[in-house]
């Protein structure tokens, strides 16, 4: 058995009105051994980092803290996600919603939520309202999800938002030697 270390990378934009309330966005850093991990999950890393960069570049000051987490060791058992949950156990009640990008680089066409709280329902409704003008529809299936790295947060009661993406070719590339940057 080969022992190795992994870690999470965390950065955030502190909220202006409710800095103690945390919105988590993220993706996982590791990949399957056959490919380079461009689709799974380099695309997700790029999407979430770009989202945070757009907020900063636009000079926006979010109401709540937006925390970007790039999880380590997802492919071998959600080790980074479990470590994040354990290390932030005392502040999980302040996590108002979480979302992960882990389905390639396809267009987001629908969002759904596992809101778990009235505040989560209200936040989901506001997010849906903001995304409607760019053609992203709200769904009503209200099932747990949002990406594997969110499972430990879901189990802890954190509301989640799932990005439904165009994944027509995702499983042709996922965990294969074809998961390369030219597919993005």
Residue spans of the language-model regions?
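Short helix-loop-beta-strand segments that form the rim/entrance of peptidase-like active sites
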Residues: 53-79
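Beta-strand segments within the central parallel beta-sheet cores of soluble alpha/beta enzyme folds
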Residues: 23-26, 63-72, 97-99
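Short helix/strand-capping connector loops at secondary-structure junctions
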Residues: 171-182
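Short amphipathic alpha-helical face segments that pack within enzyme cores
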Residues: 42-50, 78-79, 83
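Soluble metallo-hydrolase cores and metallopeptidase-like ectodomains found primarily
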Residues: 1-38, 50-63
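Alpha-helix N-cap/helix-initiation motif
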Residues: 34-44, 142, 182
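A fold-wide structural signal in alpha/beta-hydrolase
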Residues: 48, 65-67, 159
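Metal-dependent peptidase/peptidase-like ectodomains
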Residues: 1, 18-19, 33, 71-171
């Amino acid at each position: 058995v080969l022992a190795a270390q992994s870690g999470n990378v965390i950065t955030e934009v502190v909220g202006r009105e409710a800095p103690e309330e945390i919105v988590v966005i993220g993706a996982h850093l590791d990949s399957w051994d056959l490919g380079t991990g461009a689709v799974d999950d380099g695309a997700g890393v790029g999407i979430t980092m770009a989202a945070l960069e757009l907020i900063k570049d636009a000079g926006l000051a979010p109401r709540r803290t937006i925390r970007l987490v790039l999880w380590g060791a997802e492919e071998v058992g959600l080790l980074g996600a479990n470590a994040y949950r354990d290390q932030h156990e005392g502040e999980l009640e302040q996590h108002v919603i979480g979302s992960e990008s882990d389905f390639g680089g396809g267009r987001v066409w629908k969002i759904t939520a596992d809101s778990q709280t009235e505040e989560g329902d209200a936040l989901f409704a506001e997010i849906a309202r903001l995304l409607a003008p760019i053609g992203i529809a709200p769904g009503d299936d209200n099932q747990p999800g949002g990406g594997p790295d969110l499972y430990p947060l879901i189990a802890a009661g954190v509301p989640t938002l799932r990005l439904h993406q165009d994944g027509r070719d995702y499983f042709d590339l996922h965990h294969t030697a074809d998961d390369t940057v030219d597919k993005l």
